[in-house]
Amino acid sequence: MCKNNYTVFFKMLVLLLAITFQSDKVMAQVFVRDNGQKQFKHTVSAGNYSGIAPLGGTFYALADDKAPWDGFRIVEIMLDSISGAIQTVQDIKQVATANANRDAEGIVYLPHTKKLMVVGEADNRVVEYDLDGNITARELELPSGVGNGSYESLAYDTCRQILWTCTEEPFANDVPLSYSNSENAFPGALLRLQAYDRFLKFIGQWPYVTDAPTADKSVARNYASGVSELLVCGDSTLLVLERECFVPHSKIGAWVKNKIYKVKLSQMYRGNHSVVQEKSSLDAPVEKELLYSWKTSLTLLKRSFANYEGMCLGPKLVDGSQVLLLVSDSQNQAHGVLRDWFRSIIIR
């Protein structure tokens, strides 16, 4: 083969590789592969799964916001070590107490205490549980929320031992500054990213603005938008899961738009230390960058509708890439149509 042919061949090879790895889901030198969603109705009980947390190895805790008991469910999730695709999800046991369900939402595991923190929307508290499901005497010192639009998400920075949470919708005082095109307001929801130290003491908050809604909620049977989950990834990034859910009166045509945004923790931390620097002004929300987005829907021919509320880190794959695991809330497999979907997304 002559030199020119080698040059042409090399250029074609580079172009082929670029096409293979390039997509609208890749951004800022972070590669994303979506392995899609799967259901495991024969091995996982129907539920209202609103949070997921890794317990170590292949075991995970699931929060269920409508269970007849207070506690959590433990499942085992097996993944393909090369692709990160979910192979099986097996129900292990429910860890329940006689206490009333707190409308459990976000859930994280704290390795240094071997305890779980669980958000309860019903009582607007984030309290600590032991692995037997018993509530301990510790909880976050939260300001008041906004009813059912209160605290829903929870993330843990293991490097700095800092907990992050956020309301799903704006605080009452921030409502006039949200969903408006007027001066000094925002087209999306003005929320507060809040940080708490290892002693569960409040240490700072930062304004975060969601994307503007795309649907006309006045014609919806059910509508919800806002932040459904947070996740600390590595020592430099906070992932924010935004969700917009639209259900028409006919139910057919319902959809959920999901977006995962990256927020650099350097906006909140001083250098690599655990000292935070709080933004008191609402004029400059934290910067965010879209990592990945997808849409699920309910049509006459397609039943992919999935309201994703839980997100956590899975294992790292053999090539060093990171697995993100997500779980959806099916409202106990409502009407025999919705499913408890699990999804894996790969980043590096």
Where are these regions (language model features)?
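Sequence/structural signature of beta-propeller domains
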Residues: 27-348
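Bacterial Sec-dependent N-terminal signal peptides
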Residues: 1-30
